[in-house]
Each structure stands twice: as C-alpha cells, then as structure tokens.
C-alpha cells in the first residue's frame, strides 16, 4: 500500500511539533491526559500540521532504563488523534525499543505518521520497520540521530538506506545540539543531492548551543522540506527550536508554513508553558552537551546520578561526550559518576 506525503501545496515547509514527545524527556514522561488534550487542541487551532506524541524514547520507551510513563503512550496517541481536527498525529519508534506490534497499535489508535529513529550509522536496522509501515499505509519519516558524528557524505549513504527501505523523508537529527550552521547546511545539502525526488529531507534541532532556529533556517535554505520544533523549547536538553520563534522568523523571510504566528505564540504562552515542570534552560549543563556532543536526553539522567553520587552533572556530561556515548547508553553515566567519585576521594586523601 502506498501513501502520499501529507504536504499542502501552499506550504514551503511542513512543521512538526514534538512538544508531546521530545518534551516528555523534560517532563520525565509524566504527561497527563488533560495536558495532552489541551496542547493538541491549541496546536491544531494554530495550524500546526503534524503533532508527535509518544514516550520521549519512542514506542515502548516506558521502562526502568528510560523512565516510566505516567499515562500509557498508546492512550495519549488515541486521545491526540480524537482531539485533533486537522493535524496529523505522528509517533516515534526506535528499533530495539519499540516493536512492529507497537507500530500497528499506534496506527489503530489514530497515528498516521511513523517516525523511525536509528543512530546515524545504523540505518539498516530500520529496514523491516519501514517496510511494515508502508505496507500498513502509514506515512514514513526516518531519523538519523547524532548526525554531527559523521561527515555529510557518510550521512547521505545512510539516508539512502532508509529511502530505499520505504522512508519518505529522512531527517538530519542534531540530537546533541552540536551542529553549527554550515554543519547543518552541508549535511542537508548532501542528503538532498543523494535522495533527489526519492524522499524529502528534514531537520530536527536542539538549543544546546542556542542555534535551534538559526540551524533550522540553514536547513530550509539547503533544501529541507520538513522541520521539527517544540513550543516553548519543550524538549530534551535546552529544548528544541521553539516553534513560535521559528514561525516568526519564517514569516519574516517568506517561508510559508500555514501556521498562524499569533495563535502559536498564544498556545506556547497559555497552554504549553503551564504543562512544563520548568523552563528549558540554556545553562551550563546544556551548553556542555552541545559543546561536547552529548545526546540531549542524557540531561535528566546526569542530574539524577549527580545527586545520587555527589558529583557535578556537567562533568558527567563532558565525559559522556569524550566517550562518544549514544542514546541507549544512559546507564554508563553511573560508571562515570563512580569514576569521578573515586577521583574526588583519592584527591582528598592525597591532600591530607
């Protein structure tokens, strides 16, 4: 079964709001049904075309390793689909975390866009999942996470694997918020050149170096047709590119999205902000993640281990970057914390 990409000919770019997925990291996966319903309704009124809803780590992510959801994600997907009048509901899945059965259940609950994420060198593990999603008639999007870690030409080769498997849009995903302007431009351009008309190209940014909006503009100018953001930067680390700022900038440079600037600003201020446990901050921890290239969802895990072992979170994050840890290796923060703790104790003993 084939499915067309949901893309209004009046748009230059399709925007996906990921507050209810990436924001789940910041909220420690504690969304309530009332919050999801209110946020979806507000985004829908503003004209946001795609709203992503799942556990922060995708389908099946509710676990001891990643953190348990307050409300089962499939219930939230169903509620979001019932609430949205115009917007499509997307869901994320990571092979090895989610399963084919999870994809089928998400579709049955009203999800219509399946976004499949792998580390940027492991696109081949997504092949069977893209095949299933296309058979089911789902629109497909591929995420090449931690895209800053390999050069553009290598990233393009991985994008080709996804496109050949049935992916209709491959994203350059700056999971660490580590890419700087031309780093985004070169990677997006490489994917556009490789994929041609076979698939669109997208960009997912984080604010860890304060460049989420600027990097998204670079991506669009390099040929990206899909862009991610989160209202109020509601996402992992310092958060994602704020949708309300993206729309303001896109309006000013003539990039059409179909989203009303004033309505999305209202949604961010009046509906999304009250659901946030705190603002997403560009603080020392977030900056270290962007500077050292650390997966943004490590932030809350690092803070937890910092409190548990009495070591600085920013040091944990810096060493995670030095070790080139990727998503799924959050448990190694415990080893790093113990290492720093031993160093502190030996240093204190030597000083006596």
UniProtKB/Swiss-Prot annotation:
Name listed for the protein in its UniProt record: 4-hydroxy-2-oxovalerate aldolase
- PANTHER family linked to this entry: 2-ISOPROPYLMALATE SYNTHASE 1, CHLOROPLASTIC-RELATED, HOMOCITRATE SYNTHASE-RELATED
Q: What is its EC number?
A: 4.1.3.39
Please tell me where Mn(2+) binds in this chain. 22, 204, 206
Q: Which residues are listed for substrate binding in this entry?
A: 21-22, 175, 204, 295
Write down the position(s) of the site called Transition state stabilizer: 21
**Molecular-function annotations in GO:** 2-isopropylmalate synthase activity; 4-hydroxy-2-oxovalerate aldolase activity; manganese ion binding
Q: Name one Pfam family in it.
A: HMGL-like
Lyase among keywords: yes
One GO biological process this protein is involved in is: L-leucine biosynthetic process
The record's listing under PROSITE patterns reads: PYR_CT
Q: Which UniProt keywords apply?
A: Aromatic hydrocarbons catabolism, Lyase, Manganese, Metal-binding
Reaction(s) catalysed (UniProt annotation): (S)-4-hydroxy-2-oxopentanoate = acetaldehyde + pyruvate
Give the active-site positions: 25
Q: Does the keyword field hold Metal-binding?
A: yes
| Annotated family | Belongs to the 4-hydroxy-2-oxovalerate aldolase family.
Residues forming the Pyruvate carboxyltransferase domain are 13-265
| EC category name | lyase
- Its domain of life? Bacteria
Q: Where is the signal peptide?
A: none
